[in-house]
């Protein structure tokens, strides 16, 4: 294999690991938010406060699920 193919494989493995870690974190935060529900307004304020970047558009519901995480769900 040439070097470019090896680098591409390494990049795919790293990307997969990060995606799995983010998915696990989002799932655990969704479970936590189900135990301690927030109103939409509280979630939006918390999301804006922590600057998680998921406050706009179709990912707003994701923000509601991750606002209990101090890192706001980012890797």
From Swiss-Prot:
Q: Which GO terms describe its molecular function?
A: mating pheromone activity
This protein's GO cellular component annotations are: extracellular region
Q: Which domain of life is it from?
A: Eukaryota
Q: Which residues form the propeptide?
A: 20-35
**Pfam families in the record:** E_raikovi_mat
Disulfide topology: 40-55, 47-72, 52-63
- Position of the signal peptide: 1-19
Coiled-coil-forming residues are: none
What keywords is this UniProt entry annotated with?
Disulfide bond, Pheromone, Secreted, Signal
Primary localization class, coarse: secreted
* Subcellular location field: Secreted
Is Chaperone included in the keywords of this UniProt record? no
Q: What does this protein do?
A: Mating ciliate pheromones (or gamones) are diffusible extracellular communication signals that distinguish different intraspecific classes of cells commonly referred to as 'mating types'. They prepare the latter for conjugation by changing their cell surface properties.
**What is the annotated quaternary arrangement, including any partners?**
Homodimer.
Q: What is this protein called?
A: Mating pheromone Er-2/Er-9
Gene source species: Euplotes raikovi
Organism lineage reads as: Eukaryota, Sar, Alveolata, Ciliophora, Intramacronucleata
Corresponding gene?
Answer: MAT2
